[in-house]
Structure formats: C-alpha cells, structure tokens
C-alpha cells in the first residue's frame, strides 16, 4: 500500500497510508491567495493556542511546539512569497454545535483562506447524537465557505488510554461523511495515529512517554497536513488551465 513518508526531523519517519494523506478535493481559495501573494491566512480552529511545556526536570524542559507552527514553517518554505500566516482559535471542551454561534465572528476577524477544523473530541466524550454532530459540522463548513475560506476537517486524536472508554468510530464516520458530502478534505488523524501505534512508529501506550513524544507527533501531524494542503492547492479542477 502506498503512502506518504516525511521525516519528523528527529529520525522518526512519519509514514502513513496514502488513503489517509490525500486531499481528495481542491483548495481554491488558498490556492488563489498564494498565487496572488495576498495574505494566505490559515485558521486552526479549536487548537491549543500556546506551546506546551515539558514536565520540569525532564530532558527537554523547553516549550514544545504544536502542529500549527510546523504547518506555518513548512508552508512558508514551500511558498516563500505566499504570505502564509497560521493563527489559532481555541474553544476548549466545546462540541461542534457549541462552536457554531461564534464561528461567523471568528471568521470575520481572521479572514482565513483556509480553516483547519479539529472537532469531535468532546462530542465523543459527551456521547452527542451523531446526526446532530454531522449536521453541525456541515453547517460550520458552510459558514467558512460563505466567508470565502476552504476547509479541512480533522478528526480527534488517538490514545490507547481512552480508546477503550470512548467509541470514536461513529464520530469519525460522521466527520468523513460531512466532509465528503460538502466536498472538503478530511484528515483522519485518529487513524493516522492508530497506524503509528500499530506499526511501532510511536508508542502511545507507554506509562512514561518520552519527553519528545508531544513534539515529534505534532511535527509529524503538521507535515502530513502540509501534504494534504499542497495536494489540495495543486489539484487541477475541471476547466482549470
């Protein structure tokens, strides 16, 4: 099975099956912003707004970077004249439906060309109705499009410590359906991370995880998402030159 493989920068190879790393749909708004060299703002919605600090006394007692910073760094290198700026908006412990009322204002303030929407975690924890969840995601995608932005939907993270307690599968399926029916890319982070665990690329089940695990995983997620973004930007649509 073919797949994407990028280096995390620490010797880790962030391999993933190609089915999980393709855009599947174009990103015309971002492509236009990059081409016109206008500000190509990418909004990461429901992401941590600050880097995480390693535990005191650990071998890496430094600020650890989350994946939006790697997206910005890598896209700026690929499109040096594109004016790429990555910004985040965090609404912790919010379901997809709870985010909707404030979403238009966030879009108006940031004016993104692309929204990377991480959602489904708290819907899963709370056992939200999957149909209502899917409808909320579809509505959010519509809000972004009305504001002139493309969308990439990102599923929850995988953790073996919580997988036995919460069934993510119905929400992943709902996200996939909402994304495909709306014609936007779906990045199945849950399945990517599960693949890494199964293949021994990362050990998420360790009682004492390596201090570098957070940074390595976010670097890999960021670079795989860049692959999805580039795929969507460079995808030729019917009738394009």
Where are these regions (language model features)?
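Internal alpha/beta domain cores that form substrate/cofactor-binding pockets in large enzymes
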Residues: 41-43, 65, 72-76, 80-110, ...
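Extracytoplasmic/secreted cell-surface and envelope-processing proteins
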Residues: 52-54, 96-98, 123-130, 161-165, ...
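Extracytoplasmic/secreted envelope proteins and their assembly/folding machinery
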Residues: 27, 31, 68, 72, ...
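Catalytic His-Asp segment of secreted/periplasmic serine-dependent ester chemistry enzymes
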Residues: 157-241
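Active-site segments of SGNH/GDSL-like serine hydrolases
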Residues: 118-122, 140-172, 197
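Cell-envelope and extracellular/periplasmic
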Residues: 49, 88-94, 116-126, 180, ...
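Soluble non-cytosolic domains of exported or imported proteins
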Residues: 36, 61-66, 93, 97, ...
